[in-house]
Regions:
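Short tyrosine-centred short linear motifs in exposed loops/low-complexity segments
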Residues: 55, 100, 110-115, 174-175, ...
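Extracellular acidic, Ser/Thr/Pro-rich low-complexity tracts
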Residues: 65-67, 183-190, 223, 227-232, ...
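Low-complexity "stalk/linker" and mucin-like segments enriched in Ser/Thr/Pro/Ala/Gly
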Residues: 92, 200-265
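Residue-level recognition of secondary-structure-to-loop junctions
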Residues: 51, 265-272
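C-terminal edge beta-strand
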Residues: 289-297
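Bacterial N-terminal signal peptides
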Residues: 11-21
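Short, compositionally biased P/S/T/A/G/V-rich stretches that sit at domain boundaries
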Residues: 41-46, 137-171, 184-190, 202
């Protein structure tokens, strides 16, 4: 009898605790899965390190802009700095939305050892840091180690594209300026063409109905390219443009293009005057080569 009474008491106590927890939980606002258009911060990210052919070391950094729509400009200075050796170590100052991988590389001496390279960003009232280091389990390959379905021989034989950008004299707000890139590649990996998705597996933008049915805060469902670069138009060599540094985004037309006779041309239109660093990325399906060009935009 005593055991039965004790069991009932324990059961009643547990039930009361569960009810209390549920009641308290009902008052809690969970925001982990909320998507914010704007007002959120940028988290710098250390992605790993790689030893170069000359013995020095490259540290790779990216970021997460927690906004789904708002792009941020954080100039070099108190709110965007890398130490030691900073504040400017070649980091980005313009931040597209969401996750961006291997945005820039900082080269450090071979004897970097147990030192750390600290990237600090201040945005939306929050201070975030990323710590670059040489821990053995953070060593990566420059291409990310991903060859997809390519053969080992093809991946090993592949070399990065060559990319040369023509200088840009300047630009005027609202007027398109021409961007020329000379690009070549070894033809590897062999282009395989786009894979056609199965019925029912198409991207949301191909299945959505009338414009009036679309949520106003979901630009990715509208098929809008807010990345500044866009996806590759097809398998094979292509050149993609983004803003690396600058006070605002630029409208690239087209944002990604395939070269013709070794030339890839696009235009950029700016809405805000200032100094911009535009980045072109030549991608062959596995490896990428980056080059920058500076543009001064006036009214």
């Amino acid at each position: 009898m005593r055991l039965t009474a004790l069991s009932r008491l324990v059961s009643a106590t547990v039930a009361a605790l569960i009810a209390t927890a549920m009641g308290a939980g009902a008052q809690v606002e969970f925001t982990n899965n909320v998507k914010h258009d704007s007002g959120q911060d940028v988290q710098p990210v250390f992605e790993g390190w790689n030893r170069t052919a000359d013995g020095t070391i490259d540290l790779y950094f990216g970021y997460l802009n927690r906004n789904w729509v708002q792009e941020l400009h954080i100039p070099i200075g108190p709110n965007n700095h890398i130490q030691p050796g900073g504040p400017d170590r070649g980091q980005a100052t313009f931040f597209y939305t969401r996750t961006r991988r291997k945005v820039f590389v900082v080269n450090v001496p071979a004897d970097f050892g147990k030192k750390e390279l600290i990237w600090t960003l201040v945005s939306a009232g929050k201070t975030r840091t990323a710590f670059g280091h040489l821990r053995p389990d953070w060593e990566i390959t420059p291409d990310g180690g991903s060859s997809g379905t390519r053969t080992t021989q093809e991946a090993r034989a592949n070399t990065p594209p060559t990319l040369v950008l023509s200088p840009v004299a300047g630009a005027i707000v609202g007027t398109a300026v021409k961007l020329d890139a000379t690009v070549s590649d070894d033809g590897l990996p062999v282009p395989r063409g786009r894979i056609k998705p199965a019925v029912g597996q198409e991207t949301p933008s191909t299945l959505i109905g009338n414009e009036k049915d679309l949520p106003s805060n979901l630009p990715w469902l509208r098929g809008e390219d807010r990345s500044g670069g866009g996806a590759q138009p097809a398998d094979g060599l292509a050149v993609r443009w983004t803003v690396f540094r600058g006070p605002a985004a630029a409208a690239f037309q087209p944002p990604t293009s395939k070269p013709t006779d070794g030339k890839a041309t696009t235009t950029a239109t700016f809405a805000v005057p200032g100094e911009y660093t535009l980045r072109a990325a030549a991608h062959d399906g596995l490896l990428t080569t980056h080059r920058d060009v500076t543009v001064t935009v006036t009214k």
